[in-house]
Amino acid sequence: MSINSFDNYPMSWKPDLSRASGPKYLALVSLMEDDIKNGTLKAGTKLPPQRELADYLNVNLSTISRAFKLCGQKGLLSASVGNGTYVCADVSAETILLCGRENPRLIEMGALVPQVSGNRLVKSYTERLLKRPDALNLFSYDDPEGTGLQREAGVAWFQKSGFSTHKDHVLLAAGGQNALTAALGALLERGDKLGTDPLTYPGVKTAAKLLGIHLIPIQNHDYEMTEEGIRYAVQNEKIKGIYVIPDYHNPTSHIMSLKTRKMIAALAREKHILVIEDGINNLLTENPLPPIASFAPEQVIYLSSLSKTIAAGLRTAFVHVPDQYHRCLATTLYSMNISISPLLAAVSAGLIADGTADEIIRGRKEELRRRNHIISQSLKGFALDCPPTSPMRYLRLPDYFTGKSFEICAKQAGV
């Protein structure tokens, strides 16, 4: 029995293990999952200190530690040195944003899906490609790392972002998420820690959860990682690297300053940490800033997918890989994919080589300007965050709305 009385002691969570069977740490994990689902434990709740909870439950501290560690691996908890342990802010959020078409009358705004106006150009090029005498080869296996011409196309694609590399440092992946998951799996081990922005892309969370990698929120100022925050995480959290989206960050839509890009590159070199830079939206910005990779190419894995800029179904991404990571990442991509689709890779490379990709990107940017003008006019008088050229805009809700009530009203209105 616990030495201390907790009858009138305020605790954010008082689980009941009296009916638990089997290992107590697993029972505690199960109770936490249930309490999160039923709303007893809400997102953002700070949990009691582990020693305090162990005393309350009359169990060994190691039981609580094992339970919290497993909950962290499941994506339920987030902990940092000196700040305690919290229920993850997005623990109840839907991780799969793409939906089917069961309700065609519902306007889908959950996932960031590019407009389809450029698809006719992709279709036209694909039709010409399939009429070539060697078109049957596009349905066979191909070079797992991409052909020389495809990797040269990757070099040309990166140059559009102001980043110069060599084809020997370019790998191909089956889209940005595939590239990101491969990079995490190849270069980090289960239990390793990766620094991210406090608000970050849901896809890195699902990949990290799959691989048992812990995401550590880095201190931000004006939506950008601070030097102090990165140094603290390296020293105290022992992070192995950081993940960043410098351009039209998902979900904040912030564009990282040139000063911060250079600071991250300098710290990566000084501390010998990995930087995974997601450049998926770089070419949609009006005046693209140089990627972090351009300042520290030997420390940065630079991912650039064609999904948001050319076509969502063109599952191709180019990956800049420094020498020190090349063999490991190439092997992981092979293990995951065997080979990327020769057809999609050939279409992607061809669109870049003949200038069609540039035409589609110009159309995308013009469409974004038109859409942003519409939303600015339609919601005049309301506070709209994010740049007026962004693929995402944020509406600051009036006081009479909560996020949940707005979501319900929007769904009733068909959104």
Regions inferred by a protein language model and the residue ranges of each:
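Short hydrophobic/aromatic beta-strand micro-patches
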Residues: 320, 394-396
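N-terminal basic, amphipathic alpha-helical segments
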Residues: 1-130, 139, 150, 330, ...
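Hydrophobic residues in beta-strands of the RecA-like P-loop NTPase core, especially within AAA+ ATPase
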Residues: 196, 276-277
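Short Gly/Ser/Thr- and Asp/Glu-enriched loop/turn motifs at secondary-structure junctions
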Residues: 82, 166-167, 386-392
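PLP-dependent aminotransferase class I/II
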Residues: 301-378, 384-387
